[in-house]
Amino acid sequence: MADEATNPNTNGPGSGILRQILNLEDAILIEPQLHAVTPAQHAARDAADAVRRLIRGLESTSAPIDQLANLTAELDRLTRTLTEDLPATTSSEKSTVTYQAHRLRERSPFIGQANPVALPLVMEFVEGGIDAVANFSSLYEGPPGCLHGGYIAGIFDEVLGAAQTFSGHAGMTGRLTIHYRSPTPLNTDLHLRARLESVSGRKIMCKGTLHAGDRLCAEAEGLFISVDPKKLLGFISS
């Protein structure tokens, strides 16, 4: 079957197809106003913010050994308090769209607001794809003053994976190709653009760019393979 470019106007965030197949994206990005943040979620996000501040402090600290030892003991105590007698999530709970939407929105390693190690990435659905902004500190340094290439690959996988939902199908990454064009600076607003390119059977192709100001830092192509959402949720719960 020949590749056919998908019309974003028929498969955009407002389409019934996308809403039926990808309720996760509805919950996370498309209609956040329909998903009020609960007091428990606010508390978890505040705690995650506090841990992020701690991580940033540890990354740059020159505190003496005894102070670090006391900090370690206190963190161990807090960890025990936090993890004692926590109920396990059942397989049936994991297999629901509601659970997975909450997991991605709150705990995703890329956009999870309650995940203290989530990357500083903010995505927005636009016509035909995704626009995103990220700003990385020295925590993510690879070459001196520059973002590590592994994080560049990771954020491309995230934004291209979101853009492929405009095909009207749920796809998983089959191949990700990164072209590193120039060093990507730290402590700078980075602008990512991801667009759906074509659909051929189960194959969904997307392309993206990463800029720091006017400078092109990287480009990417992603091949995604569409998967039945029910089968995917079944796999997650197994």
Predicted features and spans:
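Active-site helix/loop of acyl-thioester processing domains in fatty-acid/polyketide metabolism
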Residues: E127-G129, L147-A170
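Alpha-helix N-cap/helix-initiation motif
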Residues: P144-G145, G149, P183
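HotDog/MaoC-like acyl-thioester-processing domains
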Residues: A2-E93, T184-L186, E197-S238
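Short, structured beta-strand/loop micro-motifs enriched in basic residues and often containing a Trp
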Residues: G171-R175
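Long amphipathic N-terminal alpha/beta scaffold segment
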Residues: I65-E141
